[in-house]
Amino acid sequence: SKAVLFLTMKILHLSSSDIAGGAARAAHRLHSGLRLSGHDSHMLVGKKSADEVEVHQYYGPRGLSDRFYRKRRRGKIAKDWQKSSVNRPAGFDRFTDDRSAHGRLLLEEINDYDIVNLHWVSEFVDLGEVLPELTSRVPVVWTLHDMNAMTGGCHYDAGCGRYQSQCGSCPQLGSTEAADLSRQIFDRKARAFGDIDANNLTIVTPSEWLGTCAESSTLLGKFPRQVIPYGLNLDDFTPRDR
């Protein structure tokens, strides 16, 4: 029989949280499974809850100019949201900006990995400041846990369909303005994704439905896609006799 060559990889998962929320737990399960398979997997997160050495809380540089940079960016994002959410109807899911207070600073923490896997990264990874440069350095996989990567801010479009052309006049903002916050976010994402070589970013979805959404979207349509259902630890979840 032929010997099987197993190559271990050094992998970084980027996630807004490690275990708080369903998307974070899915990311953490993948990270844990990869480690059990012999890979050198790490998580870099905006909020750490688990007591695990391979999960790293991101704090960012603490210099005076860096703190001012984050404060200024945080204030601008909050001001734009405050102005744009005045007429927002009740009952919708989260709506998040493509920017984060960290901006480009996050790139300083991402070195010497074979591959980077993004997960639910809202309010943590600044897409325009991070993704184009990151994808030029290292292969990137983005595992989508909802629709946010392809929209102007919503995490589920509730049948709106604007993500297939261009966001604006957003129902989830209660907006009738074409150049509203959803259009601004959509256009910034379009510039960021436009600066990325299609071969440097792979989109992974846990369902065929979400994969079809990505394929039909203006923002993600050019990138290769794979459907990989969520994994479970079969030591915990396995058929048993009743």
Feature-to-residue mapping (PLM):
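Short, Lys/Arg-enriched N-terminal segments with co-localized hydrophobic residues
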Residues: 1-8
